[in-house]
Design a protein with these regions (language model features):
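Intrinsically disordered, low-complexity linker/propeptide segments enriched in Ser/Thr/Gly/Pro
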Residues: 24, 191, 282-283
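C-terminal segment of N-terminal export signals and the immediately downstream linker at the start
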Residues: 1-6, 23-36
Length: 322
């Protein structure tokens, strides 16, 4: 009789403990995702991924501290590094920049020239550079103006360099080439997408993409067949509103794993001049755009100038449950 009562008490204690552990586990799960994936932009080749990740996290911590919050060390943070893979593709394809055509006599790549011209024209209109300013750079050249005329494209880039108030012509050229290779060459996209996809699990994950990284993350999230759970996709300085880039992903679609998509940009960031709205990136549900970032970096596009924005830090902190 005594043993029977003791067994029942032990069983009740065990059940109570199990229920309590379940409640605790649910509470922990409800506090927010335990994973954070950070996807960097272009121009990161031959850099130390550990140091890059540390720079991102230090800036995130500063942003959280402004809100009186702390980014806990227990969060599992992934930083998929594709900088060297992209650099190999750049060297393998050897797509000449228009400045290379001028200085080295490189062969023109018509497909890239059209892509670059469309990007440059988008940047020109968005930054307020006038036709007269471009004409001044083109000078007395009698060749017909158009996307297949590399001299005309160079004139637009020089005008952007002088009057655009943001990125240099060299940076715009390199950006256009890198995005061109990623969006138009299947092997390049597949390799880079796989690097980022390898950092994802089916655990709830906040995902942050900057510049080209926001394009890569979008590509992965819309094509991955796993049961991913992304309560927040945060894009910073995202160029998906540029038609030449957007058209590479038609038909456009909202990534199924994403619960909320928050797109933050500086209106003087030449790469991200267009919000991801109905006019520039029509998807359902609509993307929430935030245009009040005052990016403190020289070209208004740097990641540090985005991550320390109070509203960006707020959304990220809320999603992480901190």
């Amino acid at each position: 009789m005594g043993h029977s009562l003791l067994d029942r008490r032990s069983l009740l204690t065990g059940v109570t403990a199990s229920v309590a552990m379940g409640i605790i586990s649910a509470a922990v799960g409800a506090t927010g995702p335990l994973r954070l994936v950070l996807v960097h932009g272009r121009g990161q080749q031959r850099l130390d991924p550990t140091e890059l990740k540390s720079n991102w996290l230090n800036t995130l911590r500063r942003g959280a501290q402004k809100l009186g919050r702390t980014l806990p060390d227990t969060i599992d943070v992934a930083f998929p590094y594709y900088g060297d893979a992209l650099d190999r593709s750049i060297r393998n394809y050897n797509v000449p920049l228009t400045s290379d055509i001028e200085t080295r006599g490189s062969k023109v790549d018509d497909e890239f020239l059209v892509f670059q011209a469309e990007c440059a024209e988008t940047f020109r209109k968005g930054s307020g550079v006038t036709d007269a300013q471009v004409d001044s750079e083109y000078g007395a050249n009698t060749n017909p103006k158009g996307p297949l005329n590399w001299e005309w494209v160079q004139a637009i880039l020089r005008a952007l360099d002088k009057y655009g108030g943001g990125m240099s012509s060299a940076a715009i050229e390199s950006f256009s080439r890198d995005v061109f290779l990623y969006t138009t060459r299947a092997d390049v996209r597949e390799e880079i997408d796989q690097i980022v996809a390898n950092s994802l699990t089916e655990q709830p994950t906040v995902m942050v993409g900057h510049s080209l990284g926001s394009v890569v993350a979008y590509s992965v999230l819309r094509s991955d067949r796993r049961s991913l759970r992304i309560p927040l996709y945060l894009t910073l300085g995202c160029p998906l509103g540029i038609r030449a880039i957007r058209d590479q992903f038609r038909p456009l679609q909202y990534p199924l794993p994403v619960k909320e998509w928050f797109n933050a940009f500086d209106t003087h960031d030449i790469v991200a001049l267009h919000p991801l709205d109905r006019a520039n990136f029509p998807v359902t549900p609509e993307i929430e755009n935030y245009a009040a970032v005052k990016n403190s970096t020289g070209n208004r596009h740097g990641i540090v100038g985005y991550l320390d924005d109070p509203q960006v830090a707020q959304r990220l902190s809320d999603a992480l449950g901190i």
